[in-house]
Amino acid sequence: MSSEVTVTEHLLLQQQRAPQATGHFTSLFHDLILSAKIISRSVNKAGLLDVLGGTGDINIQGEKVQKLDEFADKVLLYRMERSGVLCAMASEEHAELIKVSAAFPRGDYILIFDPLDGSSNIDVNINVGTIFSILRRKPGKTGDVELDEVLQPGSEQIAAGYFLYGTSTMLVYTAGQGVHGFTLDPSVGEFLLSHTDIKIPDEGFIYSVNEGYWDYWDTPTREAVMYFKQPSSKEKVRSARYVGSLVADFHRTLLYGGVFMYPSDNRKGKMHGKLRYLCEASPLAFVAENAGGAATDGLYRTLDYVPLSLHNRVPLVIGSKKDVEAVANIYAKYK
């Protein structure tokens, strides 16, 4: 472990390499990291505090709101609105775009996040995480941010990543120049560089998909899953792994290689996919590509997609480049 390098030092080093940098991005990350530390503390004490279970509310996604979901969302909104570098935010838990109040300084960054991905698993102590995406508002724009400024393709992201709350708390992020991982050392309260320039293997031996939905899939999706049940090109038998927490399944795929799939199916509301583009599919696709991997909707590149709404859902196939391409080749036969 490169324990001598903190995330702040790493960010400042990156800032020095960019002559046009103003320090606003580093400031944004500082507040984002502080928010994650607060969330991590509550996640680690979840069994001892009154933060397990649901609130009784239903969010914009039609999902039951968990107490920790609500807590994480409030922490991020409170801390980030006061960062002085944002002009707007969007959260999985809110129907509308959240504009930074005129009572606070505003910048030109837009933060989009899923405050606690996988929160339905928190009661059984499964890894959860915070996924984030950072955009910059369009040049020349002033005043309140409009929705069209947020509906950008993933290729326009300034940075993206996630915090993973598990046996340890990790930050994995990219600003378009490599993917780096940091592990929180609770004894000093700092994220320390633990994974430098992460590269996903070209081909993996793990496929991850919820096969409980087999009866609801179309023919190309079934064929793709059957493909991964066969030995790989290296004649190695693949293993199936599915946690059910997107950020946990993706993190394993990033480090070990393979493919994670969340395809569309013919259930009500899932015909165009389930994962939210702006706060789930797009940021993870940005991480995957910067680590040498790939991400598609099964056929087309995820980062090229232009979302139509704040909570636009899409299918996702993400992971090792060869494995994602194999799925695309199967889908192309049925195009």
Swiss-Prot record:
Cofactor: binding comment: Binds 2 magnesium ions per subunit.
Residues reported to bind Mg(2+) 2: 114, 117, 280
Positions that bind Mg(2+) 1: 92, 114, 116
Family matches, as InterPro entries: FBPase_C_dom, FBPase_class-1, FBPase_N, FBPtase
UniProt-annotated location(s): Cytoplasm
Binding positions for substrate per the UniProt entry: 117-120, 210, 242, 274
Record GO cellular component, one term: cytosol
Reactions catalysed: beta-D-fructose 1,6-bisphosphate + H2O = beta-D-fructose 6-phosphate + phosphate
Biological pathway: Carbohydrate biosynthesis; gluconeogenesis
Listed Gene3D superfamilies: 3.40.190.80, Fructose-1,6-Bisphosphatase, subunit A, domain 1
Keyword Coiled coil included in the entry's annotation: no
Main location per the UniProt record: cytoplasm
Any Pfam family matching the protein: FBPase_C
Listed cofactors: Mg(2+)
An individual GO BP term: fructose 1,6-bisphosphate metabolic process
Keywords (A to Z) from UniProt: Carbohydrate metabolism, Cytoplasm, Hydrolase, Magnesium, Metal-binding
GO molecular function, one term: magnesium ion binding
EC number of the protein: 3.1.3.11
EC category name: hydrolase
Quaternary context: Homotetramer.
Family: Belongs to the FBPase class 1 family.
UniProt-recorded name of the protein: Fructose-1,6-bisphosphatase class 1
Source organism per UniProt: Lawsonia intracellularis (strain PHE/MN1-00)
Lineage of the species this protein comes from: Bacteria, Pseudomonadati, Thermodesulfobacteriota, Desulfovibrionia, Desulfovibrionales
